[in-house]
Amino acid sequence: VDEMDARFNGEGINGHATGLKDLDELVQGLRGSHVIIIAGRPGTGKTTLGLGIAEQLTIRESKSALVFSLEMSAKELSKRSLASSSAVTLGSIDTGQAMGNGESITRITGAVSRMHSADLRICQKGGLPLSRIRNIARFQHRAKPLDLIVIDYIGLIAPEASSRQQNRNLELGAISRGIKAMAKELDIPVIVLAQLNRSIETRSTKKPQMSDLRDSGEIEQDADIIMIAHRDADSDLGRSGVTEIDVVKHRHASVGHCLLQHQGEFARFVNYAGQREQQQEAAAPAPRKSSKSLLNDFNPRGGF
């Protein structure tokens, strides 16, 4: 009743915000026990969007999140977070060029401070079966309650030893049911990244559909929300990074779509305003550090 009253009076969304206005209006909050699928072809920004939501909760809202990065290392993800939070390009961070620019150093100093204060935990172990993922999540949740889990991505979750001879479709069905059970057990939203079938690229209509989920099995049935990231590489908008997020399933709201601006150089999405946003975060003034000192400070949180 209190929840309904708050919603009636316009007091925010029901669940965690993504930090992206149009997406929040569409999704209406990431709720406890829900499984949210973010699907797309390689290069459409699945990891960027999933990590960005985790950053929103941990860096900007002081909540706790656990990211299972089955593909990238914790250091790679942390560099992306650093670029996103500092508005210093990922390329200049990766090559070290950022350390030769005073403004970049100031921005990075502020971002490093915010990241150190954030409870963003990263598990970088690859080839984990779901049973191991659930045990790690339980342990981390007991240590300090989590508000969100992100799994990047479902296709890299290893089969259980007892089911390795099964069809992969059946394995993914069991994995999907297990992820839903974990979300309900911990009563937190779980974001799961997923690949789309390559066959999209050979169709005349390249806009993805829910049926394009690779080895979809029971993923469509178990998920509470399915959103698909799509960027039209043949259009001027697509080439400038404008990305369509198509919510093709939502148990508690209407389906629909919104546009986000992908800023690949900063490894982040921002609100789409009809033009290329030149969004630069104003970092708080900070004492200038030497390049060596800053690099020593930059250690990925977690990485267990």
Please tell me what each predicted stretch does.
Residues 154:
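Conserved Walker B
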Residues 87, 129-146, 163, 177-186, ...:
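C-terminal regions of RecA-like/P-loop NTPase motor modules
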Residues 1-88, 103, 109-110, 296, ...:
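The Walker A/P-loop phosphate-binding site
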Residues 25, 56-145, 159, 258-261, ...:
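Cytosolic-facing regulatory segments adjacent to core modules
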Residues 1-33, 88, 102-105, 112-123, ...:
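Core recognition of P-loop NTPase motor domains used across DNA-transaction enzymes
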Residues 12, 91-101, 121-127, 158-173, ...:
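Flexible beta-alpha connector loops of hexameric P-loop NTPases
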